[in-house]
């Protein structure tokens, strides 16, 4: 990957990330005035559950696909890259479908026994329906990132945020017009609709690419083994991080209650911290996360071509830039 292409991809993803986060900042202000800090707290309680499920079913496969597609494309093995994409997407969709059914069916257990908040049961059920759509969207993103085409992931990121904000505002207006209580359900519904829109957009774009959807897959078992060999350690890593984050989500409100806060006050304080303060603190990470996403396929390409000196150089340069940016 040329420097120009790398910086262009990083610029596109960074711009999309900045626009999305700015919109998200005002979106959280809107939520704070509509569902309140307690509603944001309930919403923030169930969001890590989605991250945990996607960590188990999709994130590892997504990263593996980006790396494999880039490697096969660099070696001129276009069909191999497309076969990996199709099998990986089907595998992620299958796993996320099982997870969605399980969590939807046992939503009362997760709400009462895990999150210790019975009010989150309906939120968990609706959120569970979004898992397969999120898997499709993430896998299609990995396909385009593997081809080093950052424009599609950047565009869908903005589309997803726009749909989330618009649909939540629309549901809020509907609730007001019909005298229905405004709860955290409108935020979860907005999240579900945004994932649905991103998945539909991804499906349309892939359907227009006839080479991806028409040919026969050769050696599917070998492809599954190749994807699994790379995705398994990545999945375990993301799963461990998600489990730790989920434990934090459960413990913080409980500890706040232990120190004298009421359940409502604990949720409100937790909502202010995770829904409003923390996103502002993590705002600068947009640049580094965009660079890391673009680096994955480019390093995979250089490794496939045997350019190990370039890998060491780009690793040192990137680490230095991130340290300077963080300081």
Show which residues each predicted segment covers.
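N-terminal membrane topogenesis motif
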Residues: 1-23, 79, 83-86, 218-241, ...
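Signature of the first transmembrane helix
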Residues: 5-66, 100, 130-131, 237-255
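Interfacial transmembrane-helix starts/ends
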Residues: 7, 44, 77-94, 102, ...
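Interfacial/gating helices of multi-pass transporter permease domains
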Residues: 32-52, 180-186, 225-230, 253-282, ...
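Helix-loop junctions and terminal segments of transmembrane helices
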Residues: 59-74, 282-306
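Short membrane-interface helical motifs at transmembrane helix boundaries
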Residues: 98-121, 327
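Membrane-interface junctions at transmembrane-helix termini in multi-pass inner-membrane proteins
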Residues: 134-156
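Hydrophobic alpha-helical transmembrane segments
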Residues: 156-170, 178-208
């Amino acid at each position: 990957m040329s420097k120009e292409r790398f910086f262009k991809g990083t610029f596109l993803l960074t711009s999309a990330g900045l626009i999305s986060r700015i919109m998200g900042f005002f979106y959280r202000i809107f939520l704070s005035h509509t569902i309140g800090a307690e509603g944001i707290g309930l919403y923030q309680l169930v969001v890590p559950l989605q991250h945990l499920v996607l960590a188990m079913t999709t994130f590892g496969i997504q990263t593996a696909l980006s790396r494999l597609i880039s490697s096969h494309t660099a070696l001129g093995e276009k069909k191999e890259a497309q076969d990996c994409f199709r099998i990986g997407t089907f595998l992620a969709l299958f796993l996320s479908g099982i997870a969605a059914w399980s969590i939807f069916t046992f939503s009362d257990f997760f709400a009462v026994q895990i999150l210790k908040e019975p009010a989150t049961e309906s939120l968990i059920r609706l959120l569970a329906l979004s898992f397969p759509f999120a898997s499709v969207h993430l896998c299609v993103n990995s396909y385009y990132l593997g081809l080093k085409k950052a424009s599609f992931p950047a565009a869908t990121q903005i589309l997803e945020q726009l749909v989330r904000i618009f649909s939540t505002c629309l549901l809020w207006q509907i609730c007001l017009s019909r005298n229905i209580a405004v709860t955290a359900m409108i935020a979860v519904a907005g999240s579900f609709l945004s994932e649905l829109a991103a998945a539909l957009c991804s499906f349309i774009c892939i359907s227009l690419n006839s080479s991806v959807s028409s040919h026969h897959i050769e050696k599917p078992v070998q492809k599954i083994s190749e994807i699994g060999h790379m995705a398994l350690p990545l999945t375990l890593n993301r799963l461990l991080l998600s489990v730790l984050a989920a434990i934090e989500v459960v413990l913080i409100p409980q500890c706040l209650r232990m120190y004298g806060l009421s359940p409502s006050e604990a949720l409100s304080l937790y909502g202010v911290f995770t829904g409003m303060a923390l996103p502002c603190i993590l705002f600068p990470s947009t640049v580094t996360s965009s660079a890391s996403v673009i680096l994955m396929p480019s390093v995979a390409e250089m490794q496939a071509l045997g350019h190990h000196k370039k890998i060491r150089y780009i690793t040192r340069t990137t680490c230095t830039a991130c340290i300077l940016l963080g300081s």
